[in-house]
C-alpha cells in the first residue's frame, strides 16, 4: 500500500519535512517513490505539487494524519470528521447533560426540604395552641 507521509530532513531542532509517496513498509527517511511537496513547521511554509498528489490519491494512496491536515489546509481533500473528535464531543455532551440533571435534582430536593421545614413550624404552632 502506498502512503503519503512526511520525510524529515534538516539540522537538529530545525527540522523540515518533504511530503513523499512511499511504500507503507519502508522506513520514514528511506527512499521515496515520489516527492510531492515540502513543509516547514517553523515558518509554516507549505509547497504542494497538487497534480501529483491528486494522481496518487486517485491511485489509492493513504495520507497519514499530519499529511491529511496539510492537504485539507491546501484544499486538496475535504475536511473529515475524525471519530475521536466526535467521541470526545459526545462524552462532553453527556457529561453536561448529567450535570444539568443532577443540578435539577438537587434543586428539587432543596425545594422539598424547604417546604417540609416551613410546614413543620406551622404544625408545632398549632399543637402548642391546642
Swiss-Prot record:
Cross-referenced Pfam families: Ribosomal_S16 (PF00886)
Any one GO molecular-function label of the UniProt entry: structural constituent of ribosome
Low complexity: compositionally biased ranges: 110-130
Gene3D superfamilies attached to this UniProt entry: 3.30.1320.10
Cross-referenced InterPro entries: Ribosomal_bS16 (IPR000307), Ribosomal_bS16_CS (IPR020592), Ribosomal_bS16_dom_sf (IPR023803)
Ranges of Basic and acidic residues composition bias in the record: 98-109
CC per GO annotation: cytoplasm; small ribosomal subunit
Protein keywords: Ribonucleoprotein, Ribosomal protein
Protein name: Small ribosomal subunit protein bS16
